[in-house]
Amino acid sequence: MEPRDLALDTAVTRLKAAPGWYTANLPPGWNFLTPCGGVLMTVAMRAMQEELNDPDLRPLSANTHFCSPVPDGPLEVRVEVLRHGGAAAQIRAQLSSTTVPGPGLEVSATFGRVRQGVDVIDVVRPDVPGPEAAQRMDEAVGPGPRAKPLFFENFETRLALGHLWWRPGWDAGPARLMRWFQYKFPQRLADGRFDPLAIPPIADTMPPALIQKLGPDHEPFHAPSLDLTVHFLQDTTSQWLLTNVHARRARAGYATADLELWDDRGTLLAVATQMMMLRRFPAKP
């Protein structure tokens, strides 16, 4: 499959039928089993940006609740601006399929202007191999049709810390995984910055960290997101991004994980957290 352009595939069109109403058409190239929740989140946030129509407002935080599965294809987004102030704006959006019933997902976000203030960081980028030295992951992740979701065809990926979880013969360890991601179709804004709305799809890749703790003989499962929260911290012009994921706890059919997102220059770009549901793959007929 040819790599997809996230910006093009998540573009929205304003409808004149009602205020705050947008449509999009998402191709299947961003699917796991269904579209990546982070990609759907990006669609909703593009509609938010359009509705705000204020280029100086940048995303600060966004929280998404995934209420029902949303297939690829035609989508609609309904946006409501809660407050558009001098320093920040609060906004929410509801995204759903136009072909399958269900509430879809809800996003609440804050956009803000750059302000003067303290500049402090109390964490350093993990000391792991850079993208050029790290192990390539551009291969199938197991036998059968689920081996490599279409989503990953859009990225160059490198393993910085952890095990290739689809292979046998490794020992379980901490529930941590670090990977380098680079969009094959670069996601740059007109001024050269990495598009911050390209962060949610990368943030929504946390489940394999849990497998590092379970080991190679775990029962296969998939882990649809129940929610995803992203805090957008700093811009970058880099395209290689490092995910540092820790799956802190799993019990009762659910798991929580958190993620730091760094660029290859040591800049902390974003942090994210999510709750996921652990589900067995359906039995083959």
Where are these regions (language model features)?
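Terminal targeting signals and extreme-terminal segments of soluble enzymes
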Residues: 1-285
